[in-house]
């Protein structure tokens, strides 16, 4: 398990854009499971939507990407690199994410090479599938 301080050593995201609270499972370079406790205090709820707050789908995908970042950057050879989005495919949003929900994100790296990475990613609230898709990253030197 990784706490927020350990996550911040692996990925560069910071408040208000750090969307992972903890990592509950990590197989270095292979898979990771992360948690985001969604609260009414999230800055994006001020405008999306004040009368009916929903976590934007693009931020659910970003949260999944950050869990991928932890899996990728936990590999010793990737220290000092940055994983940046190179593509997203077959993404589907299946359910709303609202304040009070706990978002569980599961990612499995399907490709992890010197300069490219791909992952299958799924997010859940409880047992309900929220989002799924394929994410691709370029690994670049900082």
Curated annotation (Swiss-Prot):
Its EC number is 4.2.1.59. GO terms for molecular function: (3R)-hydroxyacyl-[acyl-carrier-protein] dehydratase activity. It is an enzyme of class 4 (lyase). GO terms for biological process: fatty acid biosynthetic process; lipid A biosynthetic process. CDD domains: FabZ. It holds the Pfam family FabA. Its main location: cytoplasm. The active site is at 48. It is found in: Cytoplasm. GO terms for cellular component: cytoplasm; membrane. The keyword DNA repair does not apply. InterPro entries: FabA_FabZ, FabZ, HotDog_dom_sf. Keywords: Cytoplasm, Lipid A biosynthesis, Lipid biosynthesis, Lipid metabolism, Lyase. It catalyses: a (3R)-hydroxyacyl-[ACP] = a (2E)-enoyl-[ACP] + H2O. Involved in unsaturated fatty acids biosynthesis. Catalyzes the dehydration of short chain beta-hydroxyacyl-ACPs and long chain saturated and unsaturated beta-hydroxyacyl-ACPs. Belongs to the thioester dehydratase family. FabZ subfamily. This is 3-hydroxyacyl-[acyl-carrier-protein] dehydratase FabZ.
């Amino acid at each position: 398990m990784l706490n927020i301080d350990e996550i911040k050593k692996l990925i560069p995201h910071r408040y208000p854009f750090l969307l992972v609270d903890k990592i509950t499972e990590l197989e270095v370079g292979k898979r990771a499971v992360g948690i985001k406790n969604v609260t009414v205090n999230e800055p994006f709820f001020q405008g999306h939507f004040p009368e009916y707050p929903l976590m934007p789908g693009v931020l659910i995908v970003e949260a999944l990407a950050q869990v991928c970042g932890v899996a990728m950057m936990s590999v010793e050879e990737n220290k000092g690199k940055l994983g940046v989005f190179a593509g997203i495919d077959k993404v589907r949003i299946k359910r709303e994410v609202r304040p009070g929900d706990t978002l569980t994100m599961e990612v499995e790296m399907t490709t992890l090479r010197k300069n490219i990475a791909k992952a299958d990613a799924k997010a859940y609230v409880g047992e309900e599938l929220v989002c799924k898709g394929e994410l691709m990253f370029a690994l670049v030197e900082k």
